[in-house]
Amino acid sequence: MHNRSQGFFFSSCHPQNHVSYGCQSPSFIFCRCQSLNFVSRTCYPLSYFSYGNQTIGSISNSFRSLNYVSHSFQPISFMHSSFQPACSDFVGWQSPFLRRTC
């Protein structure tokens, strides 16, 4: 179970999965993702919104010890470029209300 949620969250942090998952959470997280510095901190609430109270403790721990996550989020700048189009694309079939915010 521990391994599963960790592995699951790993992919969640990857650009592609991140987009599809992020669109499900409040879109305001996207806007916050604009500042690269904040992204590191956004990672915590993002996990909270996505997972609610399922395994927040384990995730929080994972993210704190996963120093690489910070590095992994650096290329988010490239993701940011394809963020708006990708987001509106994903949201298109995900939820029209979110598209308005994106």
Swiss-Prot record:
The keyword Lipid metabolism does not apply. The keyword Repeat applies. Keywords: Keratin, Repeat. Interacts with hair keratins. It comes from the Eukaryota. In the hair cortex, hair keratin intermediate filaments are embedded in an interfilamentous matrix, consisting of hair keratin-associated proteins (KRTAP), which are essential for the formation of a rigid and resistant hair shaft through their extensive disulfide bond cross-linking with abundant cysteine residues of hair keratins. The matrix proteins include the high-sulfur and high-glycine-tyrosine keratins. This is Keratin-associated protein 25-1. Pfam families: PMG. GO terms for molecular function: structural molecule activity. GO terms for cellular component: cytosol; keratin filament. Belongs to the PMG family.
